[in-house]
Amino acid sequence: MSELITAANIDSVIKKNNEIRNEVSGQTMKLQMNPAIMKVASRPQLALLILQGFGLIQMPIEDKFWSGAIFVKNGKIIPVLNTALPRANQYFTAWHEIYHIIFDKVSFDHFIERDNTIEERKAECFAASMLLADVDRYFIELPEMDFVSKIFLCMSVFQAPYKAVFLSLYEYAIRSENETLAKRIKEVFDVEFEDMPQRFQELGLDDSLVKPSYVVNASSLQERIRRSEVTNPELNYHKDNEEFLKNIMKEIFMITRKGE
């Protein structure tokens, strides 16, 4: 699980990002140059499309700190997204999990906490690279308006969550030595806007981005199971699809402490 970022620890997070930036930038470029992967222009929809190929499960889990995970069952990687979170968070989490699937060589085969923590930070940087490229340029070119309204506009255009936008802009502020912007970001970084959908509406923005989708969908996994049965009819561990899915759901609820 990714660390909770606050105004108090944002500088240490930026320091970690700087240490891994070149590696993550190379990984981002490698993916973006692959025509077999970059099939659609919409980055959020592309992320979901990629995960569907791995048997994506989408389901609402009432835990705001649990955005998603990768489960390994019978040697197969299965991504899960929490649809009880706003769509913007789901899109960011999707790219986070794609990093783990494609580039993470640590988290699935050993449990060295320091290495896993670094991989989580790399996954966050990768997601930001895929969704928030040039957000700083867009931000500084916006006309004069309330500071938070500018952040909401960035969220809408880049389809990214509130704190991810702030973190990218804070990195820009530090690089450009813009102390005024850095200070302003810290002042509002920890503010939680319960009325964010209403604020989006007032700005003429689509508020569905900041609302949960509550999608329940395991069809990608079911199709993957079906293909496995056709390809390997001699194997029997996929025979009972319902039991297979139920076991995964049980693990999810155990991890989120919502079930036994």
Role assignments for model-derived ranges:
Residues 1-260:
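Active-site hotspot residues in diverse enzymes, especially metal/ion-binding acidic/histidine motifs
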